[in-house]
């Protein structure tokens, strides 16, 4: 019954994706309040409307795509899977595990996520393209309708990611129905919006951090369960091929599982047959039959997660991975080199100049952004006070970044 009304995995996935979108929205609204505020109430209202129109339009598009995708899946499910349903379920579980694992850790790094988006928003507002073809990119087009395009693109991107993640997490939930999607999506959006509200109005960071830690822990419990269930589905698929039928149709007793690969089996608590146990299946990956592969996968997942988090803590304190001087975790990601992100990284001085230039942004009557193109930072006057000035600059940068 629960998986017919509320899919727990879908809720946490939607909440995570909504979280990053509301961070961008809160940063933009804070920037407008600081840059315009009480100086021009009419322009302030106009730009705020641009922000919310962009959010609403991006959300409607994602909602339509997600509804169409889920509706098509459940209407064509039997035709797509046929007798290989367990095989596809296992594949979906593994894919969902990877995606959910990657999205969980950033929830613990709320401050870094906010800083990342402050820099992205600042660059998109103040940088000018040097090539003609770049004038059609978001960085330049955002000059005219920046307060519309930035939230629209962000909500659209996060929403499309959510559609993919929800498909992976929801489809792999035992006994899940299409009716189990609307409620967790709505509740996830409400919770994400509530966190954004607390960020905008400056709620206690400690209480917010506790909430995010609990949410991330539950998210990883779901992910570990998905990984274990993926291995279980593969074992069940092999057993069905050998037995020539669907093992679940045999109930809980003999003939319903592969006794040669099973570590334990209980003749009850079947998530496919007994109401209530499907909740534990969705949250923890519970099965009444424990295969060696599924149990190993569950424990290996937590072992790998502990190692990764330990490396991140070490890197946070030392600035590099153990036994190396210049290697960080991001350097192990192939996307870092494929996308050439090294050239896009900014030094602290470049960030200081970027935020200083952002301080000179103003809006005309049409809401178009104007930037002083020839603005330069004042140079240091004496070498004797250079170290004090650098420290002061870092404090100013920190204050400016927090004020956004």
UniProtKB/Swiss-Prot annotation:
Pfam families listed in its UniProt record: FTR1
Membrane topology reported for the UniProt record: Multi-pass membrane protein
Extra remark: Present with 8370 molecules/cell in log phase SD medium.
GO molecular function terms noted in the UniProt entry: ferrous iron transmembrane transporter activity; iron ion transmembrane transporter activity
GO BP of this protein: arsenate ion transmembrane transport; iron ion import across cell outer membrane; iron ion transmembrane transport
PANTHER family, per database record: IRON TRANSPORTER FTH1, PLASMA MEMBRANE IRON PERMEASE
The organism's place on the tree of life at top rank: Eukaryota
Keyword terms of this UniProt record: Ion transport, Iron, Iron transport, Membrane, Transmembrane, Transmembrane helix, Transport
Chain segments annotated as transmembrane: 8-28, 51-71, 87-107, 147-167, 183-203, 207-227, 294-314
Protein name (Swiss-Prot/TrEMBL): Plasma membrane iron permease
UniProt subcellular location: Membrane
Family that this chain belongs to: Belongs to the oxidase-dependent Fe transporter (OFeT) (TC 9.A.10.1) family.
GO cellular component, as recorded: high-affinity iron permease complex; plasma membrane
Naturally occurring in which organism (per UniProt): Saccharomyces cerevisiae (strain ATCC 204508 / S288c)
Protein's job: Permease for high affinity iron uptake.
